[in-house]
Amino acid sequence: MLQALNEHGVTPDMIIGTSAGALNGAFLAADPFGGANQLSHLWPGFSRETFFPGSAWKSVRTLRTSKTYLFPNDELSEFINKHIPANTFEELEVPFVAMATDVDTRLSVALDTGDLRSALLASTAIPVIFPPVERDGRLLYDGGLVANLPIRQALKMNAASLVLLDCNAPGQRDPYPDSMSGVLE
């Protein structure tokens, strides 16, 4: 989808992303012309192990020590450091916002300044799966909890037009798991 937009001359004035959309958005904001191509080569190479290392049962054992999450976000942090050249929002080519959710207020939080890595980790911190991220005195979780499609934020930033990308294949749905190990996978 991103490559098709690029090929048709659609270039964003700003990018706002939530969760995996924040990761994709950061790639595009860092490199508006090459980011889509880079993503098209990276995503197909990922497996469950890329971001969720270890067995399902090892993850359950993690709960005995962490109490709040199954997987540390170390692999994701390493991925961000390795593949996204910018360290801060200010280094990006296109204005970018990563959406997160404030644990205390349960409201969406627009992250658009300072450290990019912590913002991306916060925006992708799926509760129970990854740890929350502390940033600017707030504890933050995945932005998809309250702003999966951050249209309000785009309108607040005076976006004249919006392009929303739904990355789910039409009519395609994973089967429901039929065991605890299936849930953990």
Where are these regions (language model features)?
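Patatin-like phospholipase
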Residues: 1-80, 112-122, 166-177
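PAPS-dependent sulfation machinery
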Residues: 83
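Active-site gating loop/helix substructures
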Residues: 86-184
